[in-house]
C-alpha cells in the first residue's frame, strides 16, 4: 500500500490551535447554539475543544463508517444516528463538527439528516468544501493529513528525498 506523496502532518499543539480557531470563527457569528454533533471518530477531539470554547454542554455523536484501505473510500454505513430531539427543525441551532471533509460523502449523509445545522471542520479538501459552512484550513485533494492520534514518533525522510549535499 502506498500513501499519497503529499503529506500534511499535524501535531497535537497545531490541531488544538486550529480547533480553537474554528471555535473563534463560529463564535464570531453571534448565534445561539444549543448542541454539537460530533461525526465520529475524527470529530470527537475538535468537538470537545469547540464545546469548551463556546460553552456548549449538549454533545451528541453520529457514527458513520467508511470501510477503506487508507487509499480509497468504501461504502458508507450509519452505525448510530442523531437523537430525535436534535433532528427537530432540521438541526437548527446545532453545530456538526468533524476533523476533515475529504470527498464530502460523510457530510452529505449528515446534512441530509440535519439540513439546517451548521457544518464545521478543521480542515477541508476541495471536493468536500461546498458542504461545509466553516473551516480553518484548506488542503489540496491529493494531500494526506496525518492526525496526531494516528501517529507515533518516527524518522521522516526529507521532502527532496535522499539528496546528499
Swiss-Prot record:
Pathway: Purine metabolism; GMP biosynthesis via salvage pathway; GMP from guanine: step 1/1; Purine metabolism; XMP biosynthesis via salvage pathway; XMP from xanthine: step 1/1. InterPro entries: PRibTrfase_dom, PRTase-like, Xanthine_Guanine_PRibTrfase. Mg(2+) binds at residue 99. Xanthine binds at residues 102, 145. It comes from the Bacteria. GMP binds at residues 102-106, 144-145. 5-phospho-alpha-D-ribose 1-diphosphate binds at residues 41-42, 98-106. One of its GO terms (biological process) is GMP salvage. It catalyses: GMP + diphosphate = guanine + 5-phospho-alpha-D-ribose 1-diphosphate; XMP + diphosphate = xanthine + 5-phospho-alpha-D-ribose 1-diphosphate; IMP + diphosphate = hypoxanthine + 5-phospho-alpha-D-ribose 1-diphosphate. Its main location: membrane. One of its GO terms (molecular function) is hypoxanthine phosphoribosyltransferase activity. Purine salvage pathway enzyme that catalyzes the transfer of the ribosyl-5-phosphate group from 5-phospho-alpha-D-ribose 1-diphosphate (PRPP) to the N9 position of the 6-oxopurines guanine and xanthine to form the corresponding ribonucleotides GMP (guanosine 5'-monophosphate) and XMP (xanthosine 5'-monophosphate), with the release of PPi. To a lesser extent, also acts on hypoxanthine. Homotetramer. This is Xanthine-guanine phosphoribosyltransferase. It comes from Brucella anthropi (strain ATCC 49188 / DSM 6882 / CCUG 24695 / JCM 21032 / LMG 3331 / NBRC 15819 / NCTC 12168 / Alc 37).
Amino acid at each position: 500500500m502506498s500513501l499519497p506523496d503529499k503529506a500534511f502532518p499535524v501535531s497535537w499543539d497545531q490541531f488544538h490551535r486550529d480547533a480553537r480557531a474554528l471555535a473563534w470563527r463560529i463564535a464570531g457569528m453571534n448565534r445561539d447554539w444549543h448542541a454539537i454533533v460530533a461525526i465520529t471518530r475524527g470529530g470527537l477531539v475538535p468537538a470537545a475543544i469547540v464545546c469548551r470554547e463556546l460553552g456548549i454542554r449538549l454533545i451528541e455523536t453520529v457514527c458513520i463508517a467508511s470501510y477503506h484501505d487508507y487509499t480509497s473510500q468504501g461504502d458508507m454505513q450509519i452505525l448510530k444516528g442523531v437523537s430525535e430531539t436534535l433532528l427537530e427543525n432540521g438541526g437548527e441551532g446545532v453545530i456538526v463538527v468533524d476533523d476533515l471533509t475529504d470527498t464530502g460523502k460523510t457530510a452529505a449523509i449528515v446534512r441530509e439528516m440535519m439540513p439546517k445545522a451548521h457544518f464545521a471542520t478543521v480542515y477541508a479538501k476541495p471536493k468536500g468544501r461546498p458542504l461545509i459552512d466553516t473551516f480553518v484550513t484548506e488542503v489540496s485533494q491529493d494531500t494526506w493529513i496525518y492526525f496526531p492520534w494516528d501517529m507515533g514518533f518516527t524518522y521522516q525522510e526529507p521532502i527532496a528525498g535522499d539528496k546528499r549535499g
